Amino acid sequence: IPQIGSAKWAVIGVALFYGSMLIAGACHDSHSLHKAFEEYSTYIIFFIVLLWRARWNIDDGMKYGIACGAAITCVWVFAQYHADPEAMVTAGFVHQNPLATALNLTWPFIFYYFTQEKRPVWKGLFAVLLVSLISCLFLTTSRGAFMALGLGCIFTSAIMIVVCHGRLKDKSVQRNAAAMLVVSLICLISFNYFVEEKHTGWDPDTMGGERIMMLEASYRMWQDHKMVGIGPGNWEEYYYSEKYHPKEGREKGHVMPHNMPMLYLSEGGIVEAAGYSLFVLFFFVSVYKAARATSNKTLAAMVMLSYLTFFFHGFVDSTIFNKPAARIFYMLMAYGMMSCYAVTNKNNSLDLLNQSSVKE
């Protein structure tokens, strides 16, 4: 089994999170346990890519695979928008918000490939693809995606300054931090634009539809089932029950409260909420240690940005709960973290950087 460096913390986080989900499911009926077991299909890709990248040089395959997938998604979005500019663009996802989540995960890696590419033709193609991805992100009109991206840029800038030991006089650090802040400003302007376009205003009770009602109902579910919650996969049934459904609620078809911490608190109680919290924390530790260990700070910043954007988006939408978006997250995080550590040898196998020289 190849070494995986600080990615071991992410592995522990995944094990604790889904272990807590299995415990919560086992404490309820077979339906809940089955829903917990279903998550196997989501996180297995994380371990596959982690071990692949630790053992072999899969950089070219990943680069062109990610680029092809992103290009197909862009063509799909543009085709949907051309067919009906007023309709929601989804590109095969169940909703525009998971699509926006996937786009936010992907474009930082395309940006990285653009900065590293030396061949003029390919550099131009990556530039076109990057602009297309950002355009598709705007077409989703997802306020949560732009809010998450703005926060992700701000926190990534701060974290990378710490990682670079506060070298504010370094021109590359200044340039990257300035770029992140510009993107954050664009995200704020875009967020405000979409708020005005959807005529929701800035009132929390109206801006997010029935999100506040769903959060309040989820909290009541947890109050009644504090230790192991109502059971994985049972949120929809409980929310639309007479006991928990708000009288003012009109929206139909919600299967989660559009807030990942509250979803796992209500469905799995303290057990699952603790597992999710440790998952988020340990994953961050893995990404942070990888960023410190590598000399490729551009890649490290893009991996950190993808992770933080995904995390922040989880406060207003489904992220890790949505299987297609979650699989993309696990694949890119495993590849990104191991790429931060890996040094390619002549035989295309990979050795990890010597971490003994890195102060943790």
Show which residues each predicted segment covers.
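Hydrophobic transmembrane alpha-helices and their immediate junctions
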Residues: 125, 270-311
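Hydrophobic alpha-helical transmembrane segments in integral membrane proteins
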Residues: 191-206
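Long extracytoplasmic/lumenal interhelical loops at the membrane interface
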Residues: 202-216, 228-268
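Alpha-helical transmembrane segments of multi-pass inner-membrane proteins
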Residues: 15-23, 40-48, 57-85, 91-164, ...
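Juxtamembrane membrane-water interface segments that cap and precede transmembrane helices
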Residues: 24, 83-92, 249-262
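Membrane-interface catalytic loops of GT-C/OST-like multi-pass glycosylation enzymes that act
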Residues: 31-35, 91-96, 140-148, 255-259, ...
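Transmembrane alpha-helices of multi-pass inner-membrane enzymes
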Residues: 108, 153-154, 279-282, 300-360
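Transmembrane signal-anchor hairpin modules in multi-pass inner-membrane enzymes, especially those
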Residues: 1-23, 31, 52-60, 64-67, ...
